[in-house]
């Protein structure tokens, strides 16, 4: 086990995606993260935080000290909030372009900071979450050494269509597309091997 990505619980309610609302935290709590790290045997290596959650900028150095790399995502934060989190130690952006406020010319928000600053950006390479041209844009803006192909997959990865679980949520997979009963996309069924094949197809490499 290389490590666990703890995607939450300090995430925006507005941009939570398929995350259950009642499990989100609306104030950063370093002690809770310390408990998670202890319970995992020290295997939490990466976490996603929304910069607008009160206390998150101050939490970042404390998590880094626990050996946890901090990313930002599932967020509606503005440019200044996101830039402050990068200054505090954020090193990556979780599935850029999905479950977040998008670029606007008057406030580039998390998307603008992701492309401007020296951070890694994740791209879900299933052809559903991002248009292939968007993935090429990331590569052109960031370079191959700063773009990370990810799956965002759930337990249905590589399995037939049907009914599955995502934590406490029921998920329906049709034509390989995973969604909650209300139609909200719930991760993917992508395997890492297929993500890399897709990335090569998107880029012509």
Where are the predicted features?
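His/Asp/Glu-enriched, well-ordered alpha-helical/loop segment
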Residues: 109-123, 140-151, 156-205
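Divalent-metal coordination cores built from histidine and acidic residues
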Residues: 1-43
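Catalytic cores of large soluble enzymes that bind and process phosphate-bearing ligands
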Residues: 25-28, 126-130, 184-191
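Short, flexible micro-motifs
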Residues: 11, 20, 76, 155, ...
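A polyampholytic, Gly/Pro-enriched intrinsically disordered region
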Residues: 25, 94-99, 169-174
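Active-site core of metal-dependent hydrolases
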Residues: 31-159
């Amino acid at each position: 086990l290389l490590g666990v990505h703890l995607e939450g619980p300090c995430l925006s309610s507005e941009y939570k995606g398929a995350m259950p609302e009642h499990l989100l935290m609306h104030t950063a709590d370093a002690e809770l993260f310390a408990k998670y790290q202890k319970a995992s045997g020290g295997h939490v290596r990466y976490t996603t935080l929304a910069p607008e959650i009160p206390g998150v900028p101050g939490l970042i150095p404390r998590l880094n000290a626990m050996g946890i790399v901090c990313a930002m995502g599932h967020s509606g934060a503005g440019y200044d909030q996101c830039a402050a989190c990068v200054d505090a130690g954020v090193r990556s952006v979780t599935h850029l372009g999905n479950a977040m406020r998008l670029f606007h010319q008057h406030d580039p928000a998390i998307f603008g900071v992701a492309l401007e600053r020296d951070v890694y950006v994740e791209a879900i390479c299933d052809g559903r979450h991002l248009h292939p041209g968007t993935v090429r844009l990331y590569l052109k803006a960031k370079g191959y050494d700063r773009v990370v192909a990810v799956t965002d997959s759930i337990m249905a990865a590589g399995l037939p269509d049907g009914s599955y679980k995502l934590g406490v949520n029921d998920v329906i997979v049709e034509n390989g597309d995973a969604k909650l009963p209300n139609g909200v996309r719930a991760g993917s069924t992508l395997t890492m091997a297929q993500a890399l094949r897709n990335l090569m197809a998107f880029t012509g490499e």
